[in-house]
């Protein structure tokens, strides 16, 4: 667990000392499992991406469209509180996907990924894939606290959410190895200021690239796909400390 995370917990007025110790224990246990999973990803030759965002930002639609590229082979772990709908959508596109329903939990944990990983391996999905994509539970808060051992953490911000979210949810955007502004075809409708997002990211994490993406603009997705392929070739590994 990072020093920043410890300090944040200790300064939380809603947590007692006992609560802080419990949370620290949970996060430390998750970090250990995340490190174990990272070793397993590398052993399988998988480049793992952790996609995080609010609900409805377009994560699943983006994955459906990525499935159309023949040079981008991937399988998926889906996280939602309830239903198998997102995994079912991806299976219809020919993507091997395992759904994790978390009940009331607003995030995925490394131990949850382990179970899904084993099932995908048993199905033979891992050996057919270059990437394992984790579509985290839709939430701009909780997932940013849990390391999943991914090579890259990618945050989507959809235009209808507004251009002020980066500094409102700094812990999430500090995780980002890349940021996608999704539903970019609606920028004018919502008076969305891309410049505001760029300015805020410069303050928070200037090295993270920002992509404008729209399902109506196939090239925007292709550019992002090529970026991911290049990062895999480089074997880029996130240095973010959860």
Swiss-Prot record:
Ni(2+) binds at residues 106-107, 142. The keyword GTP-binding applies. Keywords: GTP-binding, Hydrolase, Metal-binding, Nickel, Nucleotide-binding, Zinc. It comes from the Bacteria. Residues 48-211 are annotated as: G-domain. GO terms for biological process: protein maturation. The keyword S-adenosyl-L-methionine does not apply. One of its GO terms (molecular function) is zinc ion binding. Zn(2+) binds at residues 106, 142. Involved in the maturation of [NiFe] hydrogenases. Required for nickel insertion into the metal center of the hydrogenase. Exhibits a low intrinsic GTPase activity, which is essential for nickel insertion. Belongs to the SIMIBI class G3E GTPase family. HypB/HupM subfamily. This is Hydrogenase/urease maturation factor HypB. It comes from Helicobacter pylori (strain J99 / ATCC 700824). The gene is hypB.
């Amino acid at each position: 667990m990072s020093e920043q995370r410890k300090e944040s917990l200790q300064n939380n007025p809603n947590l007692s000392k006992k609560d802080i110790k419990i949370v620290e224990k949970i996060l430390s246990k998750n970090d250990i499992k995340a490190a174990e999973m990272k070793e397993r990803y590398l052993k399988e030759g998988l480049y793992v991406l952790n996609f995080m965002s609010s609900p409805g930002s377009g994560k699943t639609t983006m994955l459906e469209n990525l499935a159309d590229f023949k040079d981008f082979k991937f399988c998926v772990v889906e996280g939602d509180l309830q239903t198998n709908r997102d995994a079912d959508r991806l299976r219809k596109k020919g993507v091997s996907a395992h759904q994790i329903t978390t009940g009331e939990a607003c995030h995925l944990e490394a131990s949850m990924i382990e179970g899904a990983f084993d099932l995908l391996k048993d199905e033979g999905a891992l050996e057919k894939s270059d990437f394992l994509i984790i579509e985290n539970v839709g939430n701009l808060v909780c997932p940013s606290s849990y390391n999943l051992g991914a090579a890259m953490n990618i945050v989507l911000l959809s235009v209808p959410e507004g251009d002020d979210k980066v500094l409102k949810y700094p812990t999430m955007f500090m995780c980002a190895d890349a940021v996608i502004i999704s539903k970019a075809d609606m920028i004018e409708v919502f008076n969305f200021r891309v410049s505001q997002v760029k300015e805020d990211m410069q303050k928070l994490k200037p090295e993270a690239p920002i992509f404008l993406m729209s399902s109506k603009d196939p090239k925007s997705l292709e550019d992002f796909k090529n970026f991911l392929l290049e990062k895999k070739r480089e074997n880029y590994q996130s240095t973010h400390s959860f």
